[in-house]
Amino acid sequence: RKISQTISKQILSHLEKMAKDDAEKYNSFWKLHGKVFKLGYSDFVNRDRITPLLRFNSSAMEDADGLTSLDDYISRARESQKEIWYVAAPSREAAKVNPHSEVFRRKGLEVLYLYEPVDEFALETLAKYKDYTFKAVEHADSVVLDAFADTDEQPKAAPLSNEDMNEFDKLLETIRKVRDGERQRRA
């Protein structure tokens, strides 16, 4: 048991150093061994050392290969944000089109994308990281989300030209004639 604890501590120290000093190398390690490593969420003795080493794709990443740590997510979090939001999906494309993700996109709030079944289970078991609570986008509180301003500005429609106005007037007149014709047929 003592040997196991010592080896675990040495491995975690090495991984912490690699994650800090050579993020690219650590991300390569993560892509190969991340699925197995995530099972470490159940190691209560080392949980505080394992959690910062977890990596996920997120809405802030340019593509599905990008990875972020929970600390990096927190560094990008909006002021007064107290949740780490996530969505479980089989792919990045599915996560992006999830209807619950729309409000987060509109408000410029980052969402972690969880592709593996163990991801969601791990975050639910961890429940918190630092002062942030893990929360699935489908369980987000609308009152909390309403506190964040929309970042996507809706494009303003260009003013209509006189020619366009004339075309709309013709269309409106045609609609009125059709509608009047329908009324006469029903009568």
Locations of the language-model features?
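Conserved GHKL (Bergerat-fold) ATPase module
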Residues: 1-187
